[in-house]
Every structure is written in C-alpha cells, then in structure tokens.
C-alpha cells in the first residue's frame, strides 16, 4: 500500500489502524536544535482526540504521544523523529456484524476490491483515527513555523448543516476572536452560531443521523515566495494535503467557488504602495505565496456510520440492510479543525525549506 507519506524536505509518513495496537509516524526533515518534547505536541492532540465533549464520538482515547527518536536532551537532532500513540478503547466486537458486509459511503468496498482484504474493525487504515499522527507531526511543524518565522496556522468551524456563522465575525482576519474559537467545543468564532450548532447536533444524535460541515484554515505572516510552479504550486500542494483528510469532498482557496459570479474588476487583488487592497486569491498568486494571509476552506461530508438503516451488499453481492453500530461522530467536521491546521502547517514548512534551499 503506497501513499502513506507527504512532503519532500519535510516529510511525514504515518502507519497504524483504528483498532490496531498503535498508531505511529516518522517525521523527516525537522531542522536540528529546536526544543521539543511531548508537551509541545499533546495540546493539539487533545483538541482532536475523541470523547472530549458530548458532540463527538464517545470513544475514549487518551492519545498520549511518545517521542521514540530524533530528540536528545530536549532538542531535535536533525534525524528522523519517531512518534507513537497506543490505542486503548477499540471495542472491536462492535464491528463483528459487518465483517462480510460493506458499509455504504465508506471505504469498505473499495479497499476490498483493491486489496482483496480489509480490516473491517472501525475501517482499519481508512479510519479518521489515522489523523492523530498527522496532528502530532503538524504540531512539530506549527512550532517551528511559529518560533522561526512568526507564522501562525489556525482554523475555525464556519458551518454545520444549514447553520452558518455570521460572516462579519471573520470579515477581518486580524480581528478574529481566537480566544472565542478556543473556548468552545465547536472551534467557532461566533457565539450565536455555537448555540445553533448545539441544537442541531442534539437533534441529530436523537435521530441517529449525521451532518456535514465546512471549516476554514488561516495562515498568517507567511512570506512571499513559497510554491514551486508549475506542478508543485503552493495551492496545489495545499489542496492535495487537505483533500487527503478523511471525509473532505471539496477544497477552496480564497474566494473559491464564489469566483464564478465575480467579475475580473472585482476579483483582482489591486495593489498600492502600501500593499494589497483585497485578498480574493487567498494569499496565493500563480502558485506562489503573496505575503497575504493564506485562507483555505474545506467541506466535509456527513459520516456514513449512522443508526439509520441503509441498503448495501455483502461479500457475495447479496442485498443486506445495515445499521452501523459502534461509537461515531454525528459531525466529523468538529474534530477536523486541528487536522486541517496540521496538514496546512506540514505543507508550509515543506515549502519553506524548499524555498530556503533554492532561493536564499
């Protein structure tokens, strides 16, 4: 199985399954002499881990990360950093009924057809549990970006179902209330929308159903020049990284799909001696960072693991009806915010190292 690594100079390789013994990753390319300990990584993992609020899956995992290599006397050595997280609350028996059945909307069918075998327990490698290691690696990238370049990578939830935040709360990137984002389980900058999210999720849990979501990632203080045209454009690599997150079905950079209705006179980001007048492009022009905040949005589908009966087939292509047991998120977008931040940080650090190697 290929496709387990991302990045060139800053490279992250993950391994492990949802109900396996452990999850792990190897992080290559971290510059030497950066202070690093588990305490630098754990806060982001705590933001992603399950069982932290009534709005997410009740599966309980401490997600305590252990650094296995690449750090000596509290500092990175420049060698590969090995990270591991032990699984503790698998409850694989919940999945016995689907051992020979394909959950509709999941990767069960495609994994079985491609490999001729699959780990049906919680989705195995296709489970979003794999993203814990992305968050761990991303925490390292975020620390280096922040300490060495002053780059901040942060995200927020902007929509669940038909409940949206007030656009005015995020109209000025520099005035987003990040303390408000950190203070609620929805990572939401709009306290009014938080109430709407709460009501919607309660209703969904009662119905045994799920819903989709939209979130935004913002990277501030990114220097001009990141990106390698033409095939390794910064926006192309960023879209690739964000699309690799489980359940993501669409990525927008800047104004995204709204550009369809804009005229050129409106969309172009005009310039003055003081700088850009607008940021419709989302901080990337011609595949290269412009120095403005990088803004990306992602849309996540509703999870297919629900209590509402659905039609599918088994390994013998016979019709079956499924109710997915187990513990699942009514909205996977809620815990996706730190994952999207991590993937953005990984791409930015990779491109920063490539920029320094080639241009300065």
Curated annotation (Swiss-Prot):
Coiled coil: none annotated. GO terms for cellular component: cytosol. GO terms for molecular function: chorismate synthase activity; FMN binding. It catalyses: 5-O-(1-carboxyvinyl)-3-phosphoshikimate = chorismate + phosphate. NADP(+) binds at residues 48, 54. It is an enzyme of class 4 (lyase). This reaction introduces a second double bond into the aromatic ring system. It comes from Actinobacillus pleuropneumoniae serotype 3 (strain JL03). GO terms for biological process: amino acid biosynthetic process; aromatic amino acid family biosynthetic process; chorismate biosynthetic process. Reduced FMN (FMNH(2)). Transmembrane segments: none annotated. Disulfide bonds: none annotated. Homotetramer. Belongs to the chorismate synthase family. It comes from the Bacteria. This is Chorismate synthase.
């Amino acid at each position: 199985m290929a496709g387990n690594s991302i990045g060139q100079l800053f490279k992250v390789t993950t391994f492990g399954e949802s109900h396996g013994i452990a999850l792990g990753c190897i992080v290559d390319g971290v510059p030497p002499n950066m202070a690093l300990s588990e305490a630098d990584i754990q806060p982001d993992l705590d933001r992603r881990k399950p069982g932290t609020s009534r709005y997410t899956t009740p599966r309980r995992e401490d997600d305590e990360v252990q650094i296995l290599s690449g750090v000596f006397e509290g500092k990175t050595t420049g060698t590969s950093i090995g990270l591991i997280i032990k699984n503790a609350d698998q409850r694989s028996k919940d999945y016995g009924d689907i051992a020979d059945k394909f959950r509709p909307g999941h990767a069960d069918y495609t994994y079985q057809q491609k490999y001729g075998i699959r780990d049906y327990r919680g989705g195995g490698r296709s489970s979003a549990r794999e993203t814990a290691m992305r968050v761990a690696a991303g925490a390292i990238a975020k620390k280096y970006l922040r300490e060495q370049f002053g780059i901040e990578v942060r995200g927020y939830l902007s929509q669940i179902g038909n409940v949206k935040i007030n656009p005015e709360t995020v109209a000025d990137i520099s005035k987003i209330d990040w303390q408000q984002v950190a203070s609620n389980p929805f990572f939401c900058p709009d306290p009014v929308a938080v109430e709407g999210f709460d009501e919607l999720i309660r209703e969904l849990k009662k119905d045994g159903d799920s819903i989709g979501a939209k979130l935004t990632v913002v990277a501030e203080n990114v220097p001009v020049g990141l990106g390698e045209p033409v095939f390794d454009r910064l926006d192309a690599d960023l879209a690739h990284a964000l699309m690799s997150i489980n359940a993501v079905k669409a990525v927008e950079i800047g104004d995204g799909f709204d550009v369809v209705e804009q005229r050129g006179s409106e969309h172009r980001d005009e310039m003055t001696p003081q700088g850009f007048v607008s940021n419709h492009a989302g901080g990337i022009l011609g595949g290269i960072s412009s120095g403005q905040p990088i803004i990306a949005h992602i849309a996540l589908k509703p999870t297919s693991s629900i209590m509402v009966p659905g039609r599918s087939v088994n390994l013998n292509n016979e019709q079956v009806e499924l109710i997915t047991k187990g513990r699942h998120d009514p909205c996977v977008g809620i815990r996706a915010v730190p994952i999207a931040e991590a993937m953005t940080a990984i791409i930015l650090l990779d491109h920063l190292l490539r920029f320094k190697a080639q241009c300065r």
